[in-house]
């Protein structure tokens, strides 16, 4: 890329991981006038993302943004009983607020779907947290992301067809939640292609 570009990364620990998809992109773009701003924090929900990171997100004045959030929102705690950590309506409000704010600042966003998890691994590594994920919840939260992206001029990156070729165990590290290097590579390839397309439009305009 020859034109200066700032890219904001919004997410949770899947994005903040030291070997994550966007760090792969950063390495690939070394030497290009591209600046990445990392606004992803481990354990972050959609509500915490905009409350904690709101000032720094919009001080970045990013040309592009990538949002992948919801893994910590769509989980349940067995003893709650079985309560979602973030209700679906609340999640939708949070995501729509973030995307509307990014859009109003002139940032073009890519929204990636929430990846699958491996419950058996989660139970083995985090037994004391009593966490459980249900596939219908993940699909419902991904539906919110898709609709919000469409409403606010963002591009929805539906990774489901790509992930479907592999089991959750093949996509995640030993904790069952975080994507492994292979899965991050798959995600990086898709995000790169979408960023390229959007950036071509921006520089042509």
Residue ranges and their predicted role:
Residues 4-22, 42-45, 74:
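Catalytic nucleophile-elbow at a beta strand-turn-alpha helix junction centered on a G-D-S/GDSL motif
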Residues 27-32, 48-205:
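Alpha-helical cap/lid subdomain in secreted, periplasmic
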């Amino acid at each position: 890329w020859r034109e200066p570009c700032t890219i904001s990364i919004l997410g949770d620990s899947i994005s903040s991981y030291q070997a994550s998809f966007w760090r792969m992109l950063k390495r690939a773009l070394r030497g290009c006038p591209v600046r990445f701003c990392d606004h992803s924090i481990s354990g972050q929900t959609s509500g915490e993302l905009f409350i904690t990171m709101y000032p720094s997100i919009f001080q970045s004045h990013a040309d592009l943004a990538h949002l992948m959030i919801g893994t910590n929102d769509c989980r349940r705690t067995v003893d709650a009983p079985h309560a979602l950590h973030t209700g679906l309506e609340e999640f939708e409000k949070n995501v729509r607020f973030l995307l509307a704010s990014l859009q109003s600042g002139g940032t073009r966003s890519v929204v990636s779907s929430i990846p699958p998890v491996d419950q058996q691994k989660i139970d083995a590594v985090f037994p004391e947290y009593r966490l459980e994920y249900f596939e219908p919840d993940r699909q419902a939260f991904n539906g919110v992301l898709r609709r919000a992206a469409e409403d606010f001029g963002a591009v929805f990156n539906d990774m489901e067809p790509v992930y479907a070729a592999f089991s959750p165990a093949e996509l995640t590290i030993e904790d069952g939640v975080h994507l492994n290097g292979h899965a991050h590579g798959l995600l990086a390839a898709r995000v790169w292609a979408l960023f390229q397309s959007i950036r071509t439009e921006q520089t042509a305009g």
